[in-house]
Amino acid sequence: DLDVTYTDGSLAISADVCNLDKKVAKGYKLEYTLYANELYSDENVKVENVLVSTAVDVVNPGQIQTTKAVLNVKAPRKWSAEFPYRYTLVAELKNAKGKVVETTSTIVGFRKVEIKDTPAEEDEFGLAGCYYYINGKTVKLKGVNRHESNPAVGHAITRDMMEKEVMLMKRANINHVRNSHYPDDPYWYFLCNKYGLYLEDEANIESHEYYYGAASLSHPVEWKKAHVARVMEMVHANINNPSIVIWSLGNEAGPGENFVAAYDALKQVDKSRPVQYERNNDIVDMGSNQYPSIGWTRGAVKGDYDIKYPFHISEYAHSMGNACGNLVDYWEAIESTNFFCGGAIWDWVDQSMYNYDKKTGKRYLAYGGDFGDTPNDGQFVMNGIVFGDLEPKPQYYEVKKVYQHIGVKAVDVR
């Protein structure tokens, strides 16, 4: 976290110490040190005069003891998509004799995500409202939805493939990814932390067949624990990643009370990030919808719908076929106000698979029944702005142009 001036940082640490021995564990302590990583590098140096030690209470055999500590850091280098400065936190568990019995580490970053009311005189557009901030500044999340998919390996993406994806995104001015619709491989978060991509991490909940009707699994109490468990598994696994700036409760899984329980459980663990759940805006911190028309988006900018929170379009500009031609119309509206903090195109990469022509043996990107499979999704899996093998489509270059961070306008040209 950062202080109110976004200058000094504090790191709230919670650690579980488990006694796997048959004897009572006494006199143990945890010591924490911090190392500053070079920008875009895994090389780091120790941060001097930043050290905290906390005693571990007696731990009985087979039991877990939770310890908490706060590490204060003067003027840390802040993490953002533009300057993703990271730190490595090292924890050492020492016994009563001072001997190190276990060491672990994790990547962290100092940044502050806020949703706050803003008076007109403090807004660059002169409009009062409730806006989304990172490190004290409004941001535009220029995003895509991403499935883990590659025609060579299916869903088992390699590290080289993920690295190529990140580089392609950065070159296209993409600064945001919605992990749709499940938490991703740990290495994906590592790369987004390192190179700077704002993530919306999404719980693996999508009872799409029942959608928002009375039969939705979000209603029956029998499914409450499952909803809460999937959300909390995501949070506990990924909470340390500075790249995660939004939590999502799931996708297209209904409006019921089970998501209220999941939201409440999440907030017990992490209040530092806002929570979104597409369309079901009454129970979360920020608004969202899917595939709004350009007319609706322009109307929202004008205040036609009396929406009280910052808005993030979780899916828009469905990139099937010859699509994305009107992307600039969305962004002219989005960039005219801080009411919209951005959105995520559906989607990043085609979900195709390699197949081979029976006559020529030539390999091609197959989909929608090309394997003789029935039923199939037709071309509905081919919505990316890049092909399955990560070759950019024309849409990629359209996105790069519209998502550019600098606008240029001719003035008095002769």
Residue ranges and their predicted role:
Residues 121, 166-169, 176-385:
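Substrate-binding/catalytic cleft of secreted carbohydrate-active enzymes
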